[in-house]
Amino acid sequence: MVEQQQQEEDIWGQILRESSNKNNYFEKRDVAILGDPTSGKSLLLSKFDTVSNVESLKSIALSYTFSDIYEDDTSEDPVGRINYWSLEGEASQNDLLKFSLNKENIKNCMVIITLDFSQPWNLVESLKKWLGILEEHIKSIFKDDKNGFKNLQDKLSIKWHEYEEPTTTAATTTTTTTSNNIENNTNKTSPTTDKIQTNNVQKKKKKKVNISSAEDASVLPPLSENILINNLGVPILVACCKSDSVVMLEKDFDYKDELFDYIQQYLRRICLQYGAGLIYTSARKEINCGVTLEYIENILFGFELKSKTQLIEKDQIFVPAGWDTLAKIQVDFENQKVCKDTDEPYENIVKKPSIIKRREQTQTNSIICDDDQDFLGKIKSQLDNDDQSSINSPSTPSPLSQSSNNNNSNNNINNTSTPSINTPLQPTDKPLSDIKSSNNPVAASPSAERAALANFFTSLISKDKTSSRKDLKSSLASPPTTSVSSNAREDAKKELDKLKQQKK
């Protein structure tokens, strides 16, 4: 009995020891993601089945999340973990790059530079900017360790030589034609949804490729022309996000296939100099997101890459590092008719549309609103000026006076004996002012209305809320009264009394 209890305790102890050392079972790798603020980093990262909600990490200067990699769909324990560090993209935050890419993790790290393909006129400028920032940062890391930097450069050169084009293509293309979809359905694969596609890439059987035993780059054959002339010692992947924008560019800006080919070949030339891979992705249309994750696993963990190079579909370009050469680019470059001069600046061919310039100019002219109290104060002063001008200006003549003036002018022309307007009128029961007010009762009201409005805005400006409310209620409750209106009422009462006496 005692021996059985000891065996059970040993079993539980073994389980606890294994769980405590669980972190030692898988390797960890890091990915630093760089790019402009709206280049599509977060959406691309959200397709990698990360632990954190990537959308909630937006507008954070340096965000972090990770995803675990499993050997197959039946595995419970991960075989690897990828740590993703995403820099928001503001120039003032470049110093934070030291937390995601430093001397401790640079040997097991790769860099992804995201570009916004919906604005192709900014692609080269943005790519060169981030490559310059990355180069300056890496050189600052190894400023006192030249040998360490040389070892990383040799390692990247060896990785370039080791690339081999896959012999079979996995069903990881996110957007395919109808015929391809039928073929995929026959093979019981469904690449139509990105979530399924990403999980297939993560949970498929992982197979490590045979890595060459070469450790010295000097024994390898020399690289071809323009390859790795700017060797930073770190694997780089240039991801052109929002590649589904080709439809918008064709429709709104009249982009042709030849111009897309020119853009692709120009980017390939830059990637060749840094030994970088190139891929077009779209998180919204689920294009090449799974291929991107598969490529990351191949670079960091050495897992087999089953996706072939893609140069046919203009929104699904994929050129892995190690496949391209300057000769291949030149062959494709000669077939396009946009520009034959390789030294022509990119900005002269892919020009920024003028409509975008006007839109940016209107956005820069920001409108600053006045403070509420200042705004109400301006209205009050304007009302006060209107009241003052109405008092100083002569009153508008009534229709009666205008008609009498017309009669007077006509009588003067005809030299008749009819008295002019200056002739005294016969006495009546009502004064002329009362007649005017009775015929046009609104004549005296504008000043009263302005006074009410002035009181209203004065109450809003007042700091004392209680007193302002009382003034507002009193100004709105009591209608404007004048001495003219009271005289009119008395005259009306007298007329009624006269009528009553006549009936008697």
From Swiss-Prot:
Keyword Cytoplasm annotated: yes
User: Basic and acidic residues bias: where?
Assistant: 464-473, 488-504
Instruction: Give the residue ranges for region: Disordered.
Output: 167-195, 383-446, 464-504
Specify which residues bind ATP according to the UniProt entry for this protein: 35-42
Keywords on record: ATP-binding, Cytoplasm, Cytoskeleton, Dynein, Microtubule, Motor protein, Nucleotide-binding, Transport
Q: Does the keyword Nucleotide-binding apply?
A: yes
Source organism's superkingdom? Eukaryota
Family matches, as Pfam families: DLIC
| Biased segments, Polar residues type | 475-487
What subcellular locations does the record give?
A: Cytoplasm, Cytoskeleton
Tell me, in a sentence or two, what this protein's role is: Acts as one of several non-catalytic accessory components of the cytoplasmic dynein 1 complex that are thought to be involved in linking dynein to cargos and to adapter proteins that regulate dynein function. Cytoplasmic dynein 1 acts as a motor for the intracellular retrograde motility of vesicles and organelles along microtubules. May play a role in binding dynein to membranous organelles or chromosomes.
Q: Which PANTHER family match?
A: DYNEIN LIGHT INTERMEDIATE CHAIN
- Please report the name of this protein according to its UniProt entry: Cytoplasmic dynein 1 light intermediate chain 1
